[in-house]
């Protein structure tokens, strides 16, 4: 059975994550206040940032950067986006 959370990104009741995305208070906060949709969108953004900026996720500085960008993304604040990325156009005929 899915659970519902009031998503801080979308300011709406939405389907929540099945479990915290990682241990600790921050993981629990995300579990309690971020929808599954918002989390999936963040993972996509995170992947683009890692690839575009050639981040080594084992580097503490890169981890701090991604943590900060994640918090900004999930709180609807300005965050760094992958440079040059243009979302694909949706074809209305499909």
Swiss-Prot record:
Gene Ontology cellular-component terms listed: cytosol
InterPro entries tied to this protein: Fe_traffick_prot_YggX, Fe_traffick_prot_YggX_sf
Alphabetical UniProt keywords: Iron
GO molecular function, one term: iron ion binding
Intrachain S-S bonds: none
Top-rank taxon, per record: Bacteria
HAMAP family (alphabetical): Fe_traffic_YggX
Protein name listed in UniProt: Probable Fe(2+)-trafficking protein
Source species: Alcanivorax borkumensis (strain ATCC 700651 / DSM 11573 / NCIMB 13689 / SK2)
């Amino acid at each position: 059975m899915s659970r519902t959370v009031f998503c801080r990104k979308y300011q709406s009741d939405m389907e929540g994550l099945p479990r915290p995305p990682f241990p600790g208070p921050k993981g629990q906060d995300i579990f309690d206040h971020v929808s599954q949709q918002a989390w999936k969108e963040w993972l996509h953004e995170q992947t683009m940032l890692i690839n575009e900026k050639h981040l080594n996720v084992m580097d503490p500085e890169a981890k701090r950067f991604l943590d900060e960008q994640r918090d900004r993304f999930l709180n609807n604040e300005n965050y760094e986006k992958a440079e040059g990325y243009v979302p694909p156009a949706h074809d209305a005929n499909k």
